[in-house]
Each structure stands twice: as C-alpha cells, then as structure tokens.
Amino acid sequence: MNVPILRLVARRIAPLAIGATTLGAAFVGAPSAASGVVMHPLVADWAFVGSSPTPPTQAQCNAATSAGGTARPRRCFNPTSMQNSYNISSLLASGNDGHGQTIAIIDSFGSAPIASDLNVFDNAFGVQHLCGEANYTCQPGDPTFKILQVQGSPPAVAPPPNNGTGLENHNLWAIEVSLDVEWAHAVAPRANILLVTTPTAEVLGVQGFPDMMKAEQFVIDHHLASVITQSFGAGEETFGSAASLLNLRGAFQAAPGAGVTVLASSGDGGTANAFKTPIKNPGTIPFPSVGWPASDPLVTAVGGTYLCTDAVTGLAIDTASPPASCQAAHNPSGDHDVTWPGSGGGYSHVFGTQPWQSAALASYAATNQTGNAPLSSNRAIPDVGYNASPTSGVLVYSTEPPVAGLFCSAGTPCSSGWYVVGGTSASSPQWAGLIAIANQMSTGSGGKTMGYINPALYQLPSSDFFDVKIGNNQTDPSIPGYKAAPGWDPATGLGTPDAAKLIPDLIAYVNSH
C-alpha cells in the first residue's frame, strides 16, 4: 500500500483543495532575524554496516567505519535489546504499545523511500507493520503511517551541491527521517506515526524554523497527535535576539491546553553549540550554551548517554565488549548508563527560573562539582536522558538520495542499507514512544493524555530513572562542560527511563494534578 500523503500549503490565503490539507494563515510573527538561523538534524555520527535487508551482525558493527572514515568499533542495538534495556518489554507484553495514539515527527525534506525503508526495518525485526508501509497489505485495526507535507511558498529550490551553504544536506535528513520514524515505532509499535515534513533547508530565506513551527502549530490545532518529537535545534545565541526566538513559540504555548507533549533532542555538542553560518565552516559560541527548542521550558529536553547493557539482548550490563566509557576503568560500579560527552546541556540565557525545576538545580549546585561550567538558576536542560552515543547506537535502515553534497563525499553516507546511528536524534523519538504508551494506558483507564510533563517529571521517585553519575558533557577543550552527579544534572537530566516504573508513576501524577 502507498503511504497516504497530505499536503499543507503555506500561503496567507489558500483555498481548501479536495484531496489536500491546506492552511489558510501564514506563520504569524516570524522575525526576520530567524531567517538566518542554522538548524541541523541532531545526528551525531553514523556508520554504514551493510546493504542486505538482513540486519548486520555485531561483528559487522564492530568493524564499522564512521562517516568521517574513522574505524570506531561500536555496538548495534536492535528494538528488542533496546526495549529490554529500558524495561519497556514488560509493558509491550501487556498490550501497552501505544495503540490508538499518534506520534508526530517533525523533519525537513522527508525521505521519498521511507515507506519502503520502514517495511524493511519491520520485516527484519518482526515489528508490527503500519498501514501505509510499502509492500504491505493493511489489516483491520492496523496502526497507520502517514506523511503531512508542508509546501512552502515560494517552493524551495535546491542549490548547487558545491555552493558552500550546506543547503544540500538531503542525505543527513534522510538518515534523520529513517531514525525518527523507525525508532519511535520500535518503542511504541502500535502507535500511529505521522511524519511532518517541510521543503526547507536549514537557512532557506524566511522559511526554515518558521516553517517547522507552523507545521507543529497545525498538528496541535487539528488534534493530529498526542505527542510531538523534534530532532533539530540551534544555539539560543544564533537567533540574534531573545525576541526573535520568543516569537516562534506559539505551538509550544498551545500544546499544554491541547494535552500534547512536546519533546526535543538536547543537542550533540555538549556545552558547545556551532549552529552558525556558513554551515561548512561554522563558528562556535565561545561560552557554554544550550540549543532551542530544547531549552524552551514548554518542551521536554532529552539528552544522551552511553548505554552499557549488552546490545544483543539488553538483559544485563555488557562485560564482554562494552564501549570504552562503559568499561571498568571508567565505570567501576557497572552503571546502566554513563554520560555521553555530546549530550547537549546547560543553562538557558533566554528563559528564567522554572519553579518545578529549582529544587533539582539547587541540589546539583550543592554537589560542588569542580571544573564545571558556570551554574545558574535559569531554565536548565536536559530534563531526561536516553541512549545516544554512536558507539552504542541503534540500527537504522535508510535509502540514501543519489546526490553529491556535504554529507555524501566519497560515497558516504550515500550507500543505502543499514547504518548504526548515534546522537540525541535517537533519544527524543524513543521518549515520544514512551509517552504514546503512557497516553494509551491513561486514556484507556478514563484518564487524560500526559500533555505538559515537565513539572511531573521532577516529582517522580528517583527509582523511576537509571541515575547517571559518571562523565561530563565537554566536547570543546575551550568550553567547559558539566559533570554528572547523583540526581538531576546538566549533562543527562534526571537520568534514563526505567519504563515499567516510570510510566505508571507519570500517569498517576498527571491524573492527580
């Protein structure tokens, strides 16, 4: 079956067309300063590991070469081992699999073969098929896969591949789309997936970020999803002024009243943000900084870790072939997760103190970590963590566009097939899957959707999380990072989810407040 595609026409005045979805109001309040903001998909690193529809073996993953040409042994997590690692499997076994809920995934460009790639992924791992996949005959009651395309006005025009702007990053966005769709689906296999795409590259005129926010507003206004995940971002300082950033928040302000949870990847540069033009030679903000939309207090920011469990089964801590950061020399207590240095985190320079977070920030300050970046009482991220390290990455099947460009030199990553992928882009969609499960469980018992979860997260028992106490998120030697510590910290948030405990407790809190 062909994937259903809806098209959202972004014009100030647009008639309702049969067979297409239109939006009659242009994005309101988009500042000119936002037009130059460079946002990237938050895929940190990837390695091609095989072209066969059959998933690669762990030996193939260990021999993988990264996109930059470096041999980096890595472990490849599959859906079952990831579900076991974060105690999601028992929920799925009880029928709590996101049924009846819809996850909206926001991405640039999209990927034309995603319906086929998703089918390969589901066949390979025995995951529930979605109605809308290629090469699949829908069955009654199947969850769905649909695409909502935001059509820009004027339409996006692809630049020459060597113009230096980086607008040709279709390959990286293709991997991003495959990662987001396949892994939100892997966590909540019976949730509907709505892929929302814009035709805009990172800095295409006045489109870019405003198009993304307009798409999210449409999803919320038309009740198309109960959870939104976004795996892109830009440093707060790249917006030129706080006002130009604040004018983009309309969707986030509408989400709580609609009962919609909004999540975002916290970033892959630790405390260093380099989302500035020109893309090929970006500057670095010369002090610790955080990225938006993750820094928005109305968004749940998801940071990154090294997952130290066995990648084949996920049933125990890996003592045979763990990545270096999980080995005894660095992780003597055998912790479940340790900090991935790329985990975006720190304190906002735009958003002030959040009452629901102030106690956690004070507790972290009291740990008196030496060598830290400056502390603050402002909004801090991430809120929570999840596996994101490329050396403990997830398997993604992606058919890459046959074009040359910034991320396609020497055929990398233009090959189509299996990749092992890392970055907080892997973290946010999987948390979205968890929220879809929570929404199913709650509404199925007469409760409400989780909606705005940030205040609730900070009230949950610490036992609902795998606490991350080792490592820091410094990636640039000239920009200090933050050390992990017991409880919340600006590297991994409250920790990673022990889903079988966390989700029932989150449901109970949300429905009692």
Label every model-predicted segment.
Residues 368, 438-490:
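An often Trp-containing, charged/polar helix-loop segment at the C-terminal end
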Residues 297, 301-353:
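Polar, glycine-rich mid-to-C-terminal structural blocks
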Residues 33-301, 348-422, 428, 443-445, ...:
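Substrate-binding/charge-relay-adjacent region of secreted/lumenal peptidase catalytic domains
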Residues 426-439:
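Active-site-proximal alpha-helical segments within enzyme catalytic domains
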Residues 2-34:
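Secretory targeting and sorting signals
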